[in-house]
């Protein structure tokens, strides 16, 4: 296999992985669980410091297995019952009794959470204290990227420069663009990418869960009721929107099922997966072609998102759905040029969507971007595309760079304003 393709597969394996619960509070749970491995006894108090963006994305989302919202319960559950070896599935086996113990610690005022000034978009420092013993774990740059461990002030681990590479810079120094992703997905041996079918399995289970039980705003179930009442039809557009939103409903509502995440986001993993899976079913393609489309969607999303910080004021579901739309064109037998049209169209459609924290209404944003993916894919198949208008350049690579500029240079103050509003 080509060395470049091996790099691509390595990138996918690094940032497309199962995650139980919204990854921002789960980062605190993971840091707490790792810190607990350093202490000889259970902690008596917990202190959590996080970046503004991590704080924003933890304020309104349920922590799986707890039925509760926020960083305090995530850190306490992680410290008392988390599995430090499980990464983003750290809370998979938490029991109701352990949740009660965590809540007791919180009720006693022993769990403190505060924002801290930092240049890192993903930053979480958790300190556990038991008597005179203190363990500290610091995460920087990625949701499970441990930068430092200390016990009683003594440094016991520090990440080297290679280990400390932020998830947002994962494509740095790699020869990658939309065309190379497209060719890779088409030509790489199937057995080398078969693993990506796990994304279909995990995220489809979340979708089924969201359709069968009342989670969050029940966006998916509401659409199902509309279909049953004859108000809307069960066409490809509505089916994709309904099932993608249902998976997000379940995830943001605290379902005890993992999502296959994309670059640290479960919702974006869902947005990169479910529309592609439903389109594959519509066109009755082979399992191999589905795997190739999922690789195209997930790696395309990673590449586009590598142009801006992993947490920002920009809702990443937009560009994730652009990559999904590209893969949908491939499934329908469209050309590479038409796949580029799909990316351009989605970004033109919904690039103004902001991130105001992780919460139940994220399912609505997922449904919005998925709807844009379907419209854009249909337009692309008809060779209709947005080009040279607004932030959309004539070339797809320039458009992607424009998105990066918009987020980095134009939306930093927006992010601060959103966080300040949410903190009032």
Swiss-Prot record:
Swiss-Prot/TrEMBL GO biological process terms: L-cysteine catabolic process to pyruvate
Gene Ontology terms, MF aspect: L-cysteine desulfhydrase activity
Residues passing through the membrane, by range: none
Family under the similarity heading: Belongs to the UPF0597 family.
Protein name (Swiss-Prot/TrEMBL): UPF0597 protein Shewana3_2972
Organism, as annotated: Shewanella sp. (strain ANA-3)
């Amino acid at each position: 296999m080509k060395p470049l393709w091996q790099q691509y597969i390595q990138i996918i394996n690094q940032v497309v992985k199962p995650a139980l619960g919204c990854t921002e509070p789960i980062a605190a749970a993971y840091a707490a669980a790792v810190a607990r491995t350093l202490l000889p006894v259970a902690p008596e108090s917990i202190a959590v410091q996080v970046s503004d963006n991590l704080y924003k994305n933890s304020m309104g989302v349920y922590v799986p297995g707890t039925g509760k919202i926020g960083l305090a319960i995530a850190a306490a559950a992680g410290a008392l019952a988390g599995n430090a070896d499980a990464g983003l599935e750290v809370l998979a086996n938490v029991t109701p009794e352990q949740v009660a113990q965590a809540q007791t610690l919180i009720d006693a005022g022993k769990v403190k959470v505060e924002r801290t000034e930092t240049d890192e978009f993903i930053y979480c420092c958790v300190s556990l204290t038991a008597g005179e013993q203190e363990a500290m774990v610091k995460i920087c740059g990625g949701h499970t990227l441990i930068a430092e461990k200390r016990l009683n002030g003594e440094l016991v681990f520090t990440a080297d420069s290679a280990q400390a590479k932020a998830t947002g810079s994962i494509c740095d120094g790699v020869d990658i663009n939309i065309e190379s992703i497209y060719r890779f997905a088409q030509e790489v041996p199937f057995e080398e990418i078969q693993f990506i079918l796990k994304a279909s399995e995990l995220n489809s289970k979340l979708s089924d869960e969201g359709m069968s039980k009342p989670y969050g705003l029940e966006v998916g179930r509401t659409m199902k009721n509309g279909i049953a009442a004859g108000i809307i039809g069960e066409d490809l557009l509505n089916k994709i929107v309904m099932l993608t939103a249902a998976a997000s409903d379940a995830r943001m509502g605290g379902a005890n099922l993992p999502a296959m995440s994309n670059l640290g986001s479960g919702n974006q993993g869902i947005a990169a997966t479910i529309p592609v899976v439903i389109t594959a079913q519509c066109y009755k393609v082979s399992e191999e072609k589905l795997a190739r489309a999922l690789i195209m969607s997930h790696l395309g999303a990673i590449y586009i998102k590598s142009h801006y910080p992993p947490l920002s004021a920009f809702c990443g579901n937009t560009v994730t759905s652009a990559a999904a739309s590209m893969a949908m064109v491939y499934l329908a037998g469209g050309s590479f040029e038409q796949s580029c049209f799909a990316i351009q169209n989605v970004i033109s459609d919904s690039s103004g969507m902001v991130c105001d924290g992780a919460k139940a209404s994220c399912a609505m944003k997922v449904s919005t971007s998925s709807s844009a993916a379907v419209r854009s894919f249909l337009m692309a198949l008809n060779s209709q595309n947005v080009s040279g208008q607004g932030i959309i350049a004539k070339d797809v690579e320039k458009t992607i760079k424009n998105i990066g500029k918009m987020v980095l240079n134009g939306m930093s103050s927006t992010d601060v304003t959103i966080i300040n509003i949410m903190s009032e």
